From Swiss-Prot:
The keyword tRNA processing does not apply. Binds 1 zinc ion per subunit. GO terms for biological process: methionine biosynthetic process; methylation. Zn(2+) binds at residues 641, 643, 665, 726. Keywords: Amino-acid biosynthesis, Metal-binding, Methionine biosynthesis, Methyltransferase, Repeat, Transferase, Zinc. This is 5-methyltetrahydropteroyltriglutamate--homocysteine methyltransferase. The lineage of its organism: Bacteria, Pseudomonadati, Pseudomonadota, Gammaproteobacteria, Enterobacterales. InterPro entries: Cbl-indep_Met_Synth_N, Cobalamin-indep_Met_synthase, Met_Synth_C/arc, UROD/MetE-like_sf. The active site is at residue 694. It comes from Salmonella paratyphi B (strain ATCC BAA-1250 / SPB7).
Length: 754
């Protein structure tokens, strides 16, 4: 039985972020829909050919998305919220963009659908909305069109579909409450239709993704898989695909399904290959996810060979990435600034395809010399001086319980802070960043390229900070920010100023829609050689009598939004970052900054997928935040910010952070998230986001007032702040001014109504 290679998906955006640029040009009205569609076709063709040339036998088709693959599935099923529908009931690419962004070049603007994290990754999806009695039909044939494209190019392919049970699991009920699982019978005919169309095209295998099978699902959801897959069986071979965790706890459910193969993530799960081989039906194909799709490290192929070789020849076997390569940068070969040693430690998406080909060839032939040669740099890295810092390791070992305790409880601190800042009721602020204009990006780029000297660069940044302060004072905001003109990204900026990180030139990965990030890579022990944010915070504070927040990204978020080391625990990395940023808090305080925000938007996304593993993670995640913050004096107000979060199941840990103020993203959920804080009787101050910064729509004063009144029904008004959902980096100044003016007006109206 010959072993084949395949990937579960490939990065969509293009090496130079071509998709992002085409999307944003189209949204701005600067290019046509036909031009956008042409870029998509070009990228798909390029990526299929690149994977094929790298040694992939079965190419994924259907992994491309114009915004995200869950939203693509919603359109496939005809699941379009009424507010986003075309008048004639048709579905087009602008329908998709209205759901994701709230507006598109055609159609009426409407509130964007909710967005949240894809399992425990830094990728996002648009949450499907379900209503009682909803009807589904095949309305969006993107998958079938792309299959036709790939077949016309002569490729051997494997279409990719998000499975029906996981799709329902990922959604939310809107309107009258009901059990969304009852809709399963209604969406299955659409899946049957799609599979029939694929069978007509001669497709042998379809990858059907059911990552919900790695979760601790309620029994009713587990029971739903059998009738669902009974309905889907018989038209094509189905590769039931899971990732991000192991499947062993749900294996009894899986082996009862009428599918022909199973993909397992052997990187992030604890599944034993021998046990899987023993328990799976003998005629099933096993797809072994041996290459990490979520990191940038070169694989130890000798280790992977040993892990799987015992079952070679005993059942049909494919080797694959652990998950979609969407979460990895595209191509290491274009990284010209990484030094030779560090570069030899990495593998990006195309190199991971090459790793799969090397592994396939060795498993088919029994010849392992090429694997040993490939794996040699990994052995060298374990002993590199760039990895280990004795001073950092000593400081980490010396942490005590006192290092994570503020001097006094919140009630005492709040009195000191009220006396210091004398803020009005309903205090207004923003989350941190202001629009990253063409001028700001050009300034940073010129400096990075050496076209601008340090003095002129600093003068330019200072001017943008000054303008941000002027804008905020004109708007009447109560607590200001410096706007972060000097920062390219909230994680990358800190990584650039901390030892232990390296950076890529083109290591872009998709976050959501057209938003791409370039995560830093943790290659060694982390320390802070010098202050990072103090100079600009101090300068901004010198321009105004109002308080200016110091802005830090928290340790867990820096960890989650970086590519971490694989040779130490995540806890170790987080606490090393916390110690480095603890020194930054002390320096900001000494410079006269009285309010310091430590953003932890990723705290919840870092949760293990299985609830039974949560406690250990939350214990060290909370401790890392507290180590970071606890050096602050009582009169220094510590803020934190979180987004895309469901809080009700981690409220104990949110409270344990002991931040004086927490700002959260709530507008897309219509203040629904505040239920968690109300039920828990959260004791500290809260700033529920009053408008969605991911949409260019400007909220009205009345809309914001209504949300704040709804918030005040759950949280005492004296503990409420008024702020947007998130930072304003991706917005333009006209809409930012208009939205903030309405926000400030709404706060003033509520003060007068007291």
């Amino acid at each position: 039985m010959t072993i084949l290679t395949h990937t579960l998906g490939f990065p969509r955006v293009g090496l130079r972020r071509e998709l992002k640029k085409a999307q944003e040009s189209y949204w701005a009205g600067n290019s046509t829909r036909e031009a956008l569609l042409a870029v998509g076709r070009e990228l798909r063709a390029r990526h299929w050919e690149q994977q094929k040339q790298a040694g992939i036998d079965l190419l994924p088709v259907g992994d491309f998305a114009w915004y995200d693959h869950v939203l693509t599935t919603s359109l496939l099923l005809g699941n379009v919220p009424a507010r986003h529908q075309n008048n004639d009931g048709s579905v087009d690419i602008d329908t998709l963009f209205r759901i994701g962004r709230g507006r598109a070049p055609t159609g009426e603007p409407a509130a964007a659908a909710e967005m949240t994290k894809w399992f425990n990754t830094n990728y996002h999806y648009i949450v499907p909305e379900f209503s009682k009695g909803q009807q589904f039909r095949l309305t969006w044939t993107q998958l079938l069109e792309e299959v036709d494209e790939a077949l016309a190019l002569g490729h051997k392919i494997k279409p990719v579909l998000l499975g029906p049970v996981t799709y329902l699991w990922l959604g939310k009920v809107k309107g009258e409450p009901f059990d969304r699982l009852t809709l399963l019978k209604d969406i299955l005919p659409v899946y049957q239709h799609v599979l029939a169309e694929l069978a007509k095209r001669g497709i042998e295998w379809v990858q059907i993704d059911e990552p919900a099978l790695v979760l601790e699902l309620p029994q009713a959801w587990l029971d739903a898989f059998k009738p669902a897959y009974d309905a889907l069986a018989g038209q094509v071979k189905l590769l039931l695909t899971t990732y991000f965790e192991g499947v062993t706890p749900n294996l009894d459910t899986i082996i009862a399904l009428p599918v022909q193969g199973l993909h397992v993530d052997l990187i992030h799960g604890k599944d034993d290959v021998a046990e899987l081989h023993q328990r799976l039906p003998v005629d099933w194909l096993l797809s072994a996810g041996l290459i990490n799709g979520r990191n940038v490290w070169r694989a130890d192929l000798t280790e992977k060979y040993a892990q799987i070789n015992a079952i070679v020849g005993k059942r049909a076997l494919w080797v694959a990435s652990s998950c979609s390569l969407l979460h990895s940068p595209i191509d290491l070969s274009v990284e010209t600034r990484l030094d030779t040693e560090v570069k030899s430690w990495f593998a990006f998406a195309l190199q991971k395809c090459g790793e799969l080909a090397l592994l396939r060839d060795a498993l088919n032939s029994g010849e392992t010399a090429a694997l040993e040669e490939w794996s040699a740099p990994i052995q060298a890295r374990r002993h590199s001086r760039r990895v280990h810092n004795a001073a950092v390791e000593k400081r980490l070992a010396a942490i005590t319980a006192q290092d994570s305790q503020r001097e006094n409880p919140y009630e005492v601190r709040a009195e000191a802070q009220r006396a210091r800042f004398k803020l009005p009721a309903w205090p207004t602020t923003t989350i941190g960043s202001f629009p990253q204009t063409t001028e700001i990006r050009g300034l940073r780029l010129d400096f990075k390229k050496g076209n601008l000297d340090a003095n002129n660069y600093r003068t330019g940044i200072a001017e943008h900070i000054k303008q941000a302060i002027i804008e905020q004072e004109r708007l009447g905001l109560d607590v200001l920010v410096h706007g972060e003109a000097e920062r390219n990204d909230m994680v990358e900026y800190f990584g650039e100023h901390l030892d232990g990180f390296v950076f890529t030139q083109n290591g872009w990965v998709q976050s959501y829609g057209s938003r791409c990030v370039k995560p830093p890579v943790v290659i060694g022990d982390i320390s802070r050689p010098a202050p990072i944010t103090v100079e600009w915070a101090k300068y901004a504070q010198s321009l105004t009598d109002k308080p200016v927040k110091g802005m830090l990204t928290g340790p867990v978020t820096i960890l989650c939004w970086s590519f971490p080391r694989e040779d130490v625990t995540r806890e170790t990395i987080a606490k090393q970052i916390a110690l480095a940023l603890r020194d930054e808090v002390a320096d900001l305080e000494a410079a006269g900054i009285g309010i310091i925000q430590i953003d932890e938007p990723a705290l919840r996304e870092g949760l293990p997928l299985r609830r039974s593993d949560w406690d250990a993670y939350l214990e060290w995640g909370v401790e890392a935040f507290r180590i970071n913050a606890a050096v602050a004096k009582d009169e220094t107000q510590i803020h934190t910010h979180m987004c895309y979060c469901e809080f009700n199941d981690i409220m104990d840990s949110i409270a344990a952070l002991d931040a004086d103020v927490i700002t959260i993203e709530t507008s897309r959920s219509d203040m629904e998230l505040l239920e968690s804080f109300e039920a828990f009787d959260y004791p500290n101050e809260i700033g529920p986001g009053v408008y969605d910064i991911h949409s260019p729509n400007v909220p009205s004063v009345e809309w914001i007032e209504a949300l704040l009144k709804k918030a005040a029904q759950r949280i005492p008004a004296q503990r409420l702040w008024v702020n947007p959902d998130c930072g304003l980096k991706t917005r333009g100044w006209p809409e930012t001014r208009a939205a903030l003016a309405n926000m400030v007006k709404a706060a003033h109206n509520l003060r007068q109504a007291k």
